[in-house]
């Protein structure tokens, strides 16, 4: 009853926040309106169907999904169309003295973090392109299109798949936004000039993958890599799109990577996602170990969101248990959907020291975590306010006052102030003020 009430309340609130014309259309079609919560991202039109190729033969290891025609990419093209971002709201408040510094609105650092694309975000006359390397334990569907290449099933015959994808970022991209087709704008197909979309996909063998990652990272100024791990209710394309958006908005000059586990990309599949998250722990653990041992990357930054923080923290603990000495630079837990007591008593002691800096973002406006807390019956680590957990050895950032999304769960990559916070932490290597 609680979930049903919350479900319809969210839809009503969603409609009320629409423009008048869109609100009228949405009201007329309310029975069939599908809400993609901020736990995940709405898949593109080509990826809406769930595993239509389930059971199909696994594609050949070395494949390239077709790409739409891309314009010539003149070297050195600048980014003239960046959207001007309004003056920011007050920065996130901190509950601990050791917290990430946020410049004031009047400082030079208060500008858009995407004023210019990084060298890894190549520009064309019509859109930017970000290269994302990925590891996944999702089963290939048998389809050749990039949006449909991986589905929601576990890939038990491997299990890991590797590859790289080019992702478009519009010239007029807004910081914190994954631009997608909007039905109320009568957009029913993807356009790289307007949307963050997968342009192509190339699968790689394991050795070729880590060699390519090493080569790519060696070309960057500081030999760094940024790994993103998504949470509940996220499709493979959405995970890659979010990775590209974060890397672009952070002006990250290193290698962008994503680890995508088999989330069902469905609100009603929470328990299935939980099982798949736990199943993915050893695969992520091995991926992190290989990333350290098979490359010469100097610094690895990891951002995990929601249920993905369970996969990450348990993977780090498993690597320690197996005798691997992982050394990461930043580990960022965004809105962690983890039992707070389990984290404090069982996980943190095992992962202490694995990263130079461990940071958590929390919000008491996080409706998704409130629902998770109702389901589990215990406090969630990522709830702020009265639920906020300040733990020795971890910086805690209270993001309650700055999130304006429907469920208050996607602020880690969608709010400009948090993006700027991550910029200071990951790219500028600023220590938290003491």
Regions found by a protein language model. Give the residues of each.
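Short, positively charged and aromatic/hydrophobic N-terminal segments
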Residues: 6, 14-15
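Bacterial N-terminal signal peptides
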Residues: 27-36
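Bacterial signal peptide processing site
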Residues: 39-43
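Post-signal peptide N-terminal segment of mature Sec-exported envelope proteins
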Residues: 46-93
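Lipolytic serine-hydrolase domain surface
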Residues: 80-220, 240-299, 316-330, 335-434
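The conserved beta1-alpha1 loop
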Residues: 227-231, 335
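Short substrate-entry loop that stabilizes the transition state in hydrolases
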Residues: 235-239
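Gly/Ala-rich beta-loop-alpha elbow adjacent to hydrolase catalytic centers
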Residues: 284, 304, 308, 312
């Amino acid at each position: 009853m609680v979930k049903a009430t919350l479900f319809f309340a969210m839809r009503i609130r969603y409609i009320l926040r629409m423009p008048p014309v869109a609100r009228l259309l949405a009201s007329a079609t309310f029975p069939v309106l599908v809400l993609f919560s901020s736990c995940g991202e709405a898949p593109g039109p080509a990826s809406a169907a769930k595993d239509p190729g389930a059971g199909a033969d696994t594609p050949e290891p070395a494949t390239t999904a077709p790409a739409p025609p891309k314009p010539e990419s003149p070297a050195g093209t600048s980014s003239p169309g960046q959207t001007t971002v309004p003056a920011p709201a007050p920065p996130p408040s901190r509950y601990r003295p050791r917290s990430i510094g946020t410049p004031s609105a009047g400082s030079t650092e208060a500008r858009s973090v995407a004023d210019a694309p990084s060298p890894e975000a190549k520009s064309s006359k019509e859109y930017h392109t970000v290269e994302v390397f990925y590891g996944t334990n999702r089963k290939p569907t048998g389809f050749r299109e990039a949006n449909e290449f991986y589905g929601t099933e576990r890939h038990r015959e491997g299990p890991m798949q590797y590859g790289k994808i080019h992702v478009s970022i519009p010239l007029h991209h807004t910081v914190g936004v994954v631009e997608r087709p909007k039905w109320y704008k009568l957009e029913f197909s993807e356009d790289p000039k307007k949307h963050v979309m997968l342009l192509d996909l190339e699968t790689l063998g394991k050795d070729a993958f880590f060699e390519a990652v090493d080569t790519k990272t060696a070309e960057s100024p500081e030999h760094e890599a940024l790994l993103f791990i998504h949470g509940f209710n996220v499709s493979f394309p959405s995970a890659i799109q979010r990775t590209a958006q974060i890397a672009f908005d952070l002006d990250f000059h290193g290698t962008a990577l994503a680890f995508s586990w088999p989330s069902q990309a469905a609100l009603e599949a929470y328990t299935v996602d939980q099982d798949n998250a736990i199943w993915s722990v050893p695969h992520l653990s091995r991926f992190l170990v290989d990333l350290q041992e098979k490359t010469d990357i100097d610094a690895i930054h990891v951002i995990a969101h929601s249920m993905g923080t369970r996969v990450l923290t348990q993977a780090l603990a498993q690597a320690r248990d197996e005798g691997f000495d992982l050394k990461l630079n930043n580990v960022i837990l965004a809105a962690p959907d983890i039992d707070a007591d389990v984290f404090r008593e069982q996980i943190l002691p095992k992962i202490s020291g694995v990263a130079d800096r461990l940071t958590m973002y929390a919000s008491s406006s996080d409706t998704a975590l409130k629902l998770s807390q109702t389901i589990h019956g215990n406090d969630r680590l990522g709830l702020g306010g009265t639920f906020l957990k300040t733990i020795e050895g971890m910086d805690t950032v209270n993001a309650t006052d700055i999130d304006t999304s429907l469920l208050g769960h996607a602020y880690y990559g969608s709010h400009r102030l948090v993006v700027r916070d991550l910029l200071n932490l990951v790219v500028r290597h600023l220590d938290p003020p003491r």
